Amino acid sequence: MRVLLAPMEGVLDSLVRELLTEVNDYDLCITEFVRVVDQLLPVKVFHRICPELQNASRTPSGTLVRVQLLGQFPQWLAENAARAVELGSWGVDLNCGCPSKTVNGSGGGATLLKDPELIYQGAKAMREAVPAHLPVSVKVRLGWDSGEKKFEIADAVQQAGATELVVHGRTKEQGYRAEHIDWQAIGEIRQRLNIPVIANGEIWDWQSAQQCMAISGCDAVMIGRGALNIPNLSRVVKYNEPRMPWPEVVALLQKYTRLEKQGDTGLYHVARIKQWLSYLRKEYDEATELFQHVRVLNNSPDIARAIQAIDIDKLR
């Protein structure tokens, strides 16, 4: 099976990709989105979102990375897709699933689900702009407020010439509510298409991955939030390995505090460490205590000192 690391805006950036791919076996990472409006973006924008472009589109541990674009205008999606692959991206991905109100208000992300023709035109323009040997993928949800257009959306992606389709098994309006996940609908799309379909949504452990694949018939999954809950989730999902022990999680957090974010004004680790701990609390009781300890800290050096001060040997 293939396991992909999902794009998560404001969460899974290049530093987190570096950490997670070092302790996992991901087949591919998709970047946070590059927002495309009405211009060809400068090279520095692509390098900021995807510094791996300067390493043959791979993380330091060797996992492939693909740039994701978000926008609605085919011409500019095409030009920026061409630039992404010229800079070394291993193909490009089109975001048609982001449920953010800000993103949707500007006509991008899940808004495209309302009009599958827009998805077709955007994906087709990107496909024509990218050399045939490089993949063009599209990430969608089942629809905006219902799944009525799910087949029309899927057909648009395939007819546009996309290489593969990632389907998040909920509508935009359903957000991330667990009770609404519909792996069966993903399976219906998979049966309809000739291109590979990758299942996404509510994959938290080996059991849920097996259930998702059994119901959908997909042999590839994309994981997002779960990858933060259990830092070695791809190995759990692929090989039924146990979750990472807490001392190893702390060691990973310590390494995270030593990584420098370009352009950081001293607040990056404050937000990101607290954010990651809020995910870890769902799986590790120890993360709750650590979160309470650092939640009052408001600058990166203090956060780093607090995390670095933990004696891992005493946790074993």
Curated annotation (Swiss-Prot):
Reaction catalysis annotation: 5,6-dihydrouridine(16) in tRNA + NADP(+) = uridine(16) in tRNA + NADPH + H(+); 5,6-dihydrouridine(16) in tRNA + NAD(+) = uridine(16) in tRNA + NADH + H(+)
Disulfide linkage: none
Coiled-coil stretches: none
Site entry: Interacts with tRNA: 35, 95, 176, 272, 274, 279, 295
Binding site for FMN: 7-9, 68, 139, 200-202, 224-225
PROSITE patterns, sorted: UPF0034
A GO molecular-function annotation: tRNA binding
Cofactors, names only: FMN
EC numbers on record: 1.3.1.-
Pfam families: Dus
InterPro entries, sorted: Aldolase_TIM, DUS-like_FMN-bd, DUS_fam, DusC, DusC_C, tRNA_hU_synthase_CS
Keywords in alphabetical order: Flavoprotein, FMN, NADP, Oxidoreductase, RNA-binding, tRNA processing, tRNA-binding
Annotated family: Belongs to the Dus family. DusC subfamily.
Function per UniProt: Catalyzes the synthesis of 5,6-dihydrouridine (D), a modified base found in the D-loop of most tRNAs, via the reduction of the C5-C6 double bond in target uridines. Specifically modifies U16 in tRNAs.
Protein name in the entry: tRNA-dihydrouridine(16) synthase
Gene: dusC
